[in-house]
């Protein structure tokens, strides 16, 4: 970046705080989710100027440790989400526990299976990501609950033999574990282990409530209070001064890239086959750094407009708040907001969307 390391993240954190956010999150990726072939001002607008290289990502735990100092004391810091396989769970347990101490009890460990793009190109085994995830969660819990005693645990992926873990919780409290889960097996694991559920690619409120019920059933089966698990979600927000600005942003190549991350079944509902195959599983199998410009343009040209309106919350601030309220009525309690308006190719319209976006955030606080 042309700015000093951490400037953009800290500025974003301050802006989020000023608009009433009570948590700030960073992702965990070795490379970007936007193909480098379209990471240009033509497609990314002002975002390309702020971040000239989409594949130059800071290590998130180091970044969060830096942000922990000077942040408002009430602000929680989270990672959304770290990989269960690319990082050894003992190291993840250590990193999250460290951040919990640095933030005085305000750290959140978001975790999921990760994506193919951040694992397979780097030599990380990707044939059984869910099994690795389950073992990683069990390992983290085993270390945190060890009370300093040596831990030995059999595992096909992360065996422990006389493993020591003596970092203490902050005032008896470990970081909350928020799990990004979508499929049946992941939803069951969420119910067994998680403090919160934070899906990323569910596109309809009815699908959300159905999956939430599966999480709560799994929690009950595991002897846990099903209502103790926080129903959350990560969603992009596209807003602007008027409907025309919003529609222009929704039709941009970068925003439509998000639709490539939803499964082929979601496309089929709109009568269109996913360009990567009818049975394409979704964001976990996208490898953006290998996609050339023409491929991206041909794929995004096929995105049904109606699907885009399912993938993100979009519209005027009032319309966005109404859409979130519908999800709230289906069980959503905590929303992680991605400001998608910033990637409008028009610099003027991206900047103009900042006030409507702030209005959205203020409206969400009132729900």
Curated annotation (Swiss-Prot):
<keyword id="KW-0560">Oxidoreductase</keyword>
<comment type="function">
    <text>Catalyzes the reduction of the keto moiety of phthiodiolone dimycocerosates (DIM B) and glycosylated phenolphthiodiolone dimycocerosates to form the intermediate compounds phthiotriol and glycosylated phenolphthiotriol dimycocerosates during phthiocerol dimycocerosates (DIM A) and glycosylated phenolphthiocerol dimycocerosates (PGL) biosynthesis.</text>
</comment>
<keyword id="KW-0443">Lipid metabolism</keyword>
<comment type="similarity">
    <text>Belongs to the mer family. Phthiodiolone/phenolphthiodiolone dimycocerosates ketoreductase subfamily.</text>
</comment>
<dbReference type="Pfam" id="PF00296">
    <property type="entry name" value="Bac_luciferase"/>
</dbReference>
<dbReference type="InterPro" id="IPR011251">
    <property type="entry name" value="Luciferase-like_dom"/>
</dbReference>
<keyword id="KW-0444">Lipid biosynthesis</keyword>
<dbReference type="InterPro" id="IPR036661">
    <property type="entry name" value="Luciferase-like_sf"/>
</dbReference>
<dbReference type="InterPro" id="IPR050564">
    <property type="entry name" value="F420-G6PD/mer"/>
</dbReference>
<dbReference type="GO" id="GO:0016705">
    <property type="term" value="F:oxidoreductase activity, acting on paired donors, with incorporation or reduction of molecular oxygen"/>
</dbReference>
<dbReference type="GO" id="GO:0006629">
    <property type="term" value="P:lipid metabolic process"/>
</dbReference>
<protein>
    <recommendedName>
        <fullName>Phthiodiolone/phenolphthiodiolone dimycocerosates ketoreductase</fullName>
        <ecNumber>1.2.-.-</ecNumber>
    </recommendedName>
</protein>
